[in-house]
UniProtKB/Swiss-Prot annotation:
The gene is rplA. This is Large ribosomal subunit protein uL1. Signal peptide: none annotated. One of its GO terms (cellular component) is large ribosomal subunit. Keywords: Repressor, Ribonucleoprotein, Ribosomal protein, RNA-binding, rRNA-binding, Translation regulation, tRNA-binding. The lineage of its organism: Bacteria, Pseudomonadati, Pseudomonadota, Alphaproteobacteria, Rickettsiales. Belongs to the universal ribosomal protein uL1 family. One of its GO terms (biological process) is translation. Pfam families: Ribosomal_L1. Part of the 50S ribosomal subunit. GO terms for molecular function: rRNA binding; structural constituent of ribosome; tRNA binding.
Length: 220
């Protein structure tokens, strides 16, 4: 991630203005935040992960797949899940006959063992249902509604950086700021107990094709 000239640091509102003004692609660029945390990501107890609902959404449709059986399938369909299926769907995925083009996968606790058979397919894509994200639940309708309203997941990488989408360049600065604050709040709540002192080292915002913009420290 390259910085703008002289590594200039902006206040968050000016930073968003710079990112939006610099977006010149012939498509609607996403706006992302990258947060460098003061953590040792090699330690399992210092990995930061979680999920948060963006109050202003993502600016695009969030797609959901549901693995379940019986009445739970009907509930998922009524809740407008994009892909719904049972063991047959799992077999299609194993045979690569189903393109799972979704953002989230959900299942019910009693069907989790079946979904585990495709963990090697879902896991690398970050799609494996996880109780921590409320994607293993009997309350599928509620979970689908929350996710489609703009829920995202976040996870620190090997360098201790959290990347998250917070909208696109057509969003107002006020809407981007609300989403940004929601992500920051969720990351603060996920702060490992072992981390002392400064938590946020550097914060950058960037559009899909633009240069990153460094914004002021969040530790003040």
């Amino acid at each position: 991630m390259s910085l703008l000239a002289n590594d200039e640091v902006y206040d968050i509102v000016s930073g968003f203005k710079k990112v939006i003004e610099s977006a010149k692609a012939n498509f609607c660029e996403s706006v992302d935040v990258a947060i460098n945390l003061n953590i040792n990501s090699s330690k399992s107890d210092e990995q930061v992960r979680g999920a948060v609902v963006l109050p202003k959404g993502l600016g695009r449709e969030v797609k959901v797949a549901v693995f379940a059986k019986g009445g739970h399938l009907d509930a998922a369909k009524e809740a407008m899940a994009d892909i719904v299926g049972d063991e047959e769907l799992i077999e299609e995925i194993k045979r690569k006959k189903c393109k799972l083009d979704v953002d989230w996968c959900l299942t019910t606790p009693d069907f989790m063992s079946s979904v585990s058979s495709i963990a090697k397919i879902l896991g690398p894509r970050g799609l494996m249902p996880n109780p921590k994200f409320n994607t293993v639940t009997f309350e599928l309708s509620k979970a689908i509604k929350v996710i489609k309203s703009g829920q995202i997941r976040f996870k620190s990488d090997k360098a201790g950086i959290v990347h998250a989408k917070i909208g696109n360049v057509k969003f107002s600065i006020e809407d981007l700021l609300q989403n940004f604050n929601a992500v920051i709040g969720a990351i603060k709540q996920s702060k490992p107990a072992s981390v002392k002192g400064v938590y946020f080292k550097d914060v950058f915002i960037v559009s899909t094709m633009g240069k990153s913009v460094k914004v002021e420290s969040l530790n003040n």
